[in-house]
C-alpha cells in the first residue's frame, strides 16, 4: 500500500529542510521516493500547512525495569484514576502503566524511547516490561561500573581486550543498545558503607578509582565500536559545587566521545548566601571546549514526581527530602543499586527554582542542538508528559518570563535567564529531538524523513502556543501505520527493541558461568533475555543495528 | 527416559536452577538438588488432561465457550488465585480489563503486610547474591527460614566462596521469635544459631523494644515479649557491629493481627542502623505460588500490586476492599475464575458462585466447579518467566515434558477472545 502525506511543511535537519513544502510517500512501513505519478497513492492524507517531522526520540527516560516498577508500587496514590473513558484497548485507562507510557509518548509524536538504566541481572525484567509498552520502539542501556566482575578484572589489571569482551558480552546478554555508567564504583562502595564517592575515590576492597572504571569502560565502548558513546551519570549528582565534577569528567574523557546525562543536576555552584548558585555558564564554557562531549539536560519542571536512580549514594543522601515521606533503597545482586525517592518540585522553593533556571540556562547557552539533548530525566526532573511545556519554554521568551515571575525571586535574581533572549526554532527542536538524537544513538533508520527511513512520522498543527502544538500531534505514523489522529490513539501495535550485538571472544561465557556458579548460584541461561513478548517472536521483537564509529557531532 | 540438567524451579521463590530431573514420559523425578518444596512439586503425578464442564469431560473449545458465557453474564467477576507465570498474568489482566473483574492473588493478605509497609514508609532491601557475598550477620524475625526455603543456608550462607568474607562459615545467624525447625542454620563447623524464642503474640513487643534499644532509648523493663532485655541487647549490638547485616522475615509466618506494623518496625530498624553509620539491609521472603510474578506484572500493567478491580473501567487498588474472601462472603461476586498452575491443593475459596478453575492437573474438588480446565505448570509443561523473591531477577522456566496441556495464557486468551 502506498500512502501519501500531501503538502506538509517538512522540518528534517538530515536534509537541511526547514519548512520545505513537500509530499512524503510511505510503502510497507518505510519512507520511499516520490513515485512517478502521484495518483498511484492508495491512501492520501492532506496535511497542507501542517508541520511534519520524523518521530521524536527520547534518549534518556526511565520507563521500565525493577526500580521503575518499585516506584509504581511505592506510590499508588500518585497515579490513582478517578474517571476514565475506556478506549476498548486493554489497559488504556491504567495510569503510569506500560500502556500509558506508550500512548502518551505517541500522542506527543515520540516513537522511540531509551530506558537508560538496565542492570544486566535485571535485563529480562526490563525487557518483559518494555515488550508491554505499545506503539513506541524502545532500547536499553546496560549498566556496568559497579559490578563485581568488572571491578575484579580491574583490580587484577587485565588487558583491555578482556574488558572489551565483557562489555560486548553484556550488550549481547542484555540485548541493549549502549553502555551506561552510573557514579562509577559508587553503588558498590555504598555497600561497603561509603556515603559519598568522587571521581578519584577508590572502591573499598578493590582499590580502583571511579575515574579508572569510567575511562576503561569508555575505551571499551570505543574499541568495540558502540555507536552511542558511553552514557555517563557523573559522581556528586545534585551537590552544590559539582560543576567541577562535571568539568573534571569532561577532561577525563581525554578527547574521546562521552555522553553526560541530565547535566542540569551538575550545573551547580556553591556561592551566594545559601551556598547554592548557578554554574551553567561555567559548565557550558567547558562544554564548548570539549567537542567530544554530548549532554542531555534533565530539566526540572514543577510537579509532584518521583526520583528513580541507580545512584544509591545520591538517593540515600536525599532520603530526608522524600515527599511523601517514604523511600526505597536497594542493593542489587553485587551489580548495582536502586534508590526511589518521591519528590515535589515547587516554584516557591529557592533550590527548585534555581534548578529550573539552571536547566534553561544550559539549554539556551549551549548553542549546539547537535550536542545538547532534550530530556527531563523522566521522571526525575519531571514526567515526560510535561515535555510540551518545556518545548514552549524553549521557543517562547515571553512565556519564560511569565513563568519566572512565579518563581522564588531570590533564585531569579541569581540567574542569567532573564537576559537570555534566544528562542528555539522548529528546526532546532527537530535537530535535538529527532535527527541528532538518532545519530547519537546510532539509529540510522530513523530521526529523518529520507527514503529508506522507518516511517515514524509526526504531523503537528502549528499554533502560537507551542505546548498545545506539541502536546497533541495531529497525526502520528509508526512504521507507516496511523496510530494517532487529532490527539487521540487510533491504533495499538507492538513496538520493537533496538539492539547492537558487538563481537566478542566466546571463551568469556565459560569463565562467566564459573564465576556465576561460584558467587551467584545462577546459570547464565536462567536469566538470559528471551521470549519476552506476549505477541511477538524474538525475531520480530529485536531490531539489530550496526556497530560503528561513536557519534561525534560534526554539524556544529 | 531423559535427564534434564540445570532446571529452574518456579516453586520455591528462590530461583533455584540447579535441579536435575529425570523425565520418563510424563512422569518426573528429581534426582539431584531437590528439597522438601521442589521435589514433591515437580514429582506431582500427571492426572486429568481434559477439561470438564459440569463434571463431564469435554474439549477445550467447549470449556472455553462455557467459561466465556459465565463471565459474559456476570456483573462482578473475580479472577483469583493468580498463581501462574508472566504470560499467564498478562492474559489474566487482559481478561480482567475486558470483563471488569477484580484481580486478587491468593497470598495477597500475607503480601499486604509487606506492601503496606512499602507504601507507608518504604524500606531498604537487598537480594540473594548480596546475602551470599556480603552478609556477616543474619537476623531472622519470626520465621522458620529452612521450611520456607530449605536450601537457603546451603546456597546463600554456608558457601565455599563469598566475595567479601574470608570465612563464610563464621557468619552469625540469630533467630528472634520462632526457633528453627531443623539444623540447617548450624554452620558446617558446628556453630549453632543463636535463638531468642518468643511466641507469635509476643513478637511485636520484642521487635519494638529491639528497635528502641538500637536507637539508644532507655528501657526500664527487664524483659519484652518474654525475652530478657539483656538478650535483646545482644541482638542489637551484633546487628550494629555487623559489616553488612541482613534482617529477614516471611510474612506468612507472622500470623498475628496487624503484622504490617511489626514489618514496618523491622524495616525501620534497618534504616536506623544505616542512619547510625553502618550497613544493614532487609530481605523480605516471598515468592511462592507466583506471588512476586503476579505483583510485578500487575505493577507494570496497572500501576498496582495484584489486588485490583477493573469494575469502574479503570484499575483501582484497595488492599482491603478487593479481598476476594470478603467480597465472596458479602455476596459481591457473581462468578469467579480461579487460576492455580502450581499447586493441586490450592483450591478456590468457595464455589457458591459459578466457578471456572484453571488448575494444575490432579486438582480434586469436593464440589465440582462449573468449568475445570487442567493447565500446564510453567517450568514443567511449558516455558515461561517467573520472578524470584528479591524482584531483581526474573528467571526463564523450561519445558520438561509434553503432556498436551495448554498454558494458562493460552486458555485465558481464548476465553478473553470469546467474551
Predicted features and spans:
Chain A
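Alpha-helical scaffold segments that flank or form the walls of functional sites
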Residues: 69-139, 156-179, 208-223, 553-555
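Residue-level marker for buried hydrophobic side chains located in beta-strands
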Residues: 4, 43, 55-57, 230, ...
Amino acid at each position: 500500500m502506498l500512502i501519501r502525506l500531501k503538502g506538509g511543511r517538512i522540518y528534517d535537519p538530515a536534509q537541511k529542510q526547514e519548512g520545505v513544502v513537500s509530499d512524503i510517500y510511505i510503502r510497507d512501513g518505510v519512507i520511499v521516493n516520490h513515485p512517478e505519478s502521484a495518483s498511484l497513492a492508495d491512501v492520501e492524507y492532506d496535511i497542507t500547512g501542517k508541520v511534519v517531522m520524523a518521530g521524536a526520540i527520547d534518549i534518556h527516560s526511565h520507563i521500565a525495569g525493577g526500580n521503575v516498577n518499585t516506584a509504581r508500587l511505592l506510590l499508588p496514590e500518585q497515579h490513582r484514576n478517578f474517571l476514565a473513558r475506556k478506549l476498548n484497548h486493554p489497559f488504556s485507562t491504567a495510569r503510569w502503566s506500560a500502556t500509558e507510557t506508550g500512548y502518551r509518548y505517541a500522542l506527543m509524536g515520540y516513537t522511540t524511547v531509551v530506558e537508560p538504566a538496565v542492570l544486566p541481572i535485571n535485563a529480562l525484567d526490563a525487557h518483559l516490561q518494555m515488550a508491554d509498552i505499545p506503539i513506541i520502539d524502545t532500547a536499553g542501556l546496560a549498566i556496568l561500573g559497579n559490578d563485581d566482575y568488572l571491578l575484579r578484572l580491574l583490580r587484577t589489571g587485565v588487558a583491555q581486550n578482556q574488558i572489551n569482551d565483557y562489555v560486548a558480552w553484556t550488550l549481547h546478554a542484555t540485548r541493549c543498545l549502549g553502555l551506561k555508567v552510573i557514579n562509577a564504583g559508587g553503588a558498590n562502595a555504598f555497600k561497603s558503607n561509603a556515603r559519598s564517592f568522587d571521581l578519584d575515590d577508590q572502591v573499598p576492597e578493590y582499590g580502583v578509582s571511579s575515574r579508572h572504571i569510567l575511562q576503561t569502560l569508555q575505551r571499551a565502548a570505543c574499541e568495540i565500536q558502540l555507536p552511542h558513546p558511553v552514557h555517563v551519570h557523573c559522581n556528586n549528582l545534585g551537590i552544590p559545587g559539582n560543576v567541577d565534577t562535571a568539568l573534571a569528567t569532561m577532561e577525563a574523557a581525554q578527547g574521546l566521545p562521552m555522553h553526560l546525562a541530565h547535566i542540569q543536576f551538575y550545573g551547580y555552584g556553591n556561592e551566594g548566601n545559601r551556598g547554592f548558585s548557578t554554574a551553567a555558564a561555567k559548565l557550558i564554557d567547558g562544554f564548548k571546549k570539549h567537542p567530544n562531549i554530548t549532554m542531555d539536560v534533565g530539566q526540572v519542571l514543577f510537579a509532584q514526581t518521583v526520583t528513580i536512580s541507580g545512584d544509591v549514594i545520591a538517593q540515600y543522601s536525599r532520603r530526608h527530602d522524600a515527599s511523601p515521606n517514604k523511600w526505597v533503597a536497594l542493593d542489587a545482586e553485587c551489580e548495582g543499586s536502586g534508590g526511589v525517592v518521591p519528590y515535589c518540585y515547587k516554584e516557591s522553593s529557592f533550590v527548585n527554582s534555581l534548578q529550573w533556571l539552571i536547566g534553561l540556562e544550559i539549554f539556551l547557552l549551549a548553542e549546539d542542538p547537535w550536542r545538547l539533548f532534550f530530556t527531563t530525566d523522566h521522571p526525575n526532573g519531571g514526567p515526560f508528559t510535561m515535555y510540551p511545556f518545556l518545548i514552549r519554554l524553549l521557543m517562547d521568551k515571553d512565556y519564560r518570563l511569565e513563568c519566572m515571575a512565579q518563581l522564588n525571586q531570590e533564585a531569579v535574581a541569581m540567574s542569567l535567564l532573564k537576559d537570555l533572549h534566544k528562542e528555539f526554532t522548529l528546526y532546532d527542536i527537530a535537530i535535538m529531538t529527532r535527527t541528532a538524537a538518532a545519530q547519537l544513538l546510532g539509529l540510522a533508520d530513523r530521526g529523518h524523513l529520507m527514503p529508506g527511513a522507518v516511517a515514524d512520522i509526526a504531523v503537528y498543527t502549528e499554533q502560537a502556543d507551542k505546548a498545545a502544538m506539541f502536546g497533541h500531534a495531529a497525526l502520528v505514523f509508526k512504521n507507516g501505520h496511523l496510530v494517532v489522529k487529532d490527539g487521540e490513539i487510533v491504533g495499538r501495535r507492538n513496538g520493537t527493541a533496538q539492539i547492537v550485538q558487538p563481537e566478542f571472544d566466546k571463551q568469556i561465557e565459560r569463565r562467566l558461568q564459573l564465576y556465576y556458579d561460584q558467587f551467584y548460584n545462577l546459570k547464565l541461561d536462567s536469566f538470559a533475555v528471551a521470549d519476552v513478548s506476549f505477541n511477538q517472536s524474538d525475531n520480530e521483537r529485536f531490531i539489530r543495528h550496526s556497530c560503528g564509529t561513536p557519534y561525534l557531532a560534526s554539524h556544529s | 527416559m531423559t535427564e534434564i540438567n540445570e532446571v529452574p524451579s518456579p516453586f520455591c521463590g528462590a530461583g533455584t536452577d540447579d535441579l536435575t530431573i529425570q523425565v520418563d514420559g510424563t512422569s518426573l523425578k528429581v534426582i539431584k538438588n531437590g528439597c522438601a518444596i521442589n521435589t514433591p512439586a515437580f514429582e506431582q503425578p500427571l492426572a486429568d488432561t481434559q477439561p470438564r464442564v459440569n463434571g463431564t469431560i469435554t474439549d477445550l473449545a467447549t470449556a472455553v465457550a462455557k467459561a466465556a458465557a459465565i463471565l459474559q453474564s456476570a456483573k462482578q467477576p473475580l479472577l483469583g488465585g493468580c498463581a501462574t507465570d508472566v504470560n499467564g498474568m498478562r492474559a489474566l489482566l487482559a481478561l480482567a480489563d475486558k470483563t471488569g473483574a477484580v484481580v486478587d492473588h491468593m497470598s495477597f493478605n500475607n503480601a499486604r503486610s509487606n506492601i503496606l509497609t512499602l507504601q507507608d514508609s518504604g524500606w531498604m532491601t537487598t537480594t540473594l547474591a548480596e546475602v551470599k557475598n556480603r552478609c556477616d550477620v543474619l537476623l531472622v524475625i519470626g520465621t522458620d527460614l529452612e521450611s520456607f526455603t530449605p536450601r537457603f543456608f546451603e546456597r546463600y550462607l554456608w558457601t565455599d566462596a563469598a566475595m567479601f568474607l574470608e570465612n563464610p562459615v563464621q557468619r552469625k545467624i540469630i533467630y528472634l521469635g520462632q526457633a528453627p525447625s531443623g539444623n540447617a542454620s548450624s554452620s558446617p563447623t558446628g556453630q549453632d544459631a543463636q535463638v531468642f524464642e518468643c511466641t507469635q503474640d509476643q513478637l511485636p513487643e520484642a521487635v519494638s523494644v529491639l528497635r528502641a534499644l538500637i536507637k539508644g532509648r532507655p528501657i526500664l523493663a527487664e524483659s519484652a515479649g518474654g525475652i530478657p532485655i539483656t538478650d535483646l541487647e545482644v541482638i542489637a549490638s551484633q546487628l550494629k557491629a555487623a559489616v553488612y547485616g541482613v534482617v529477614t522475615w516471611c510474612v506468612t509466618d507472622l500470623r498475628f493481627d496487624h503484622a504490617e506494623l511489626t514489618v514496618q518496625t523491622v524495616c525501620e530498624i534497618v534504616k536506623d542502623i544505616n542512619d547510625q553509620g553502618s550497613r544493614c539491609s532487609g530481605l523480605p521472603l516471598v515468592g511462592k505460588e507466583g506471588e512476586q510474578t503476579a505483583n510485578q506484572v500487575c505493577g507494570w500493567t496497572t500501576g498496582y500490586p495484584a489486588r485490583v478491580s477493573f469494575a469502574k473501567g479503570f484499575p483501582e487498588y484497595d488492599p482491603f476492599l478487593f479481598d476476594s474472601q470478603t467480597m465472596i462472603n458479602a455476596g459481591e461476586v457473581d462468578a469467579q475464575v480461579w487460576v492455580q498452575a502450581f499447586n493441586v491443593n490450592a483450591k478456590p475459596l468457595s464455589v457458591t458462585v459459578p466457578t471456572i478453575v484453571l488448575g494444575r492437573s490432579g486438582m480434586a474438588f469436593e464440589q465440582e466447579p462449573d468449568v475445570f480446565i487442567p493447565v500446564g505448570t510453567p517450568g514443567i509443561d511449558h516455558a515461561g518467566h517467573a520472578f524470584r523473591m528479591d524482584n531483581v531477577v526474573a528467571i526463564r522456566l523450561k519445558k520438561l515434558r509434553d503432556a498436551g496441556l495448554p498454558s494458562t495464557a493460552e486458555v485465558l486468551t481464548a476465553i478473553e477472545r470469546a467474551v
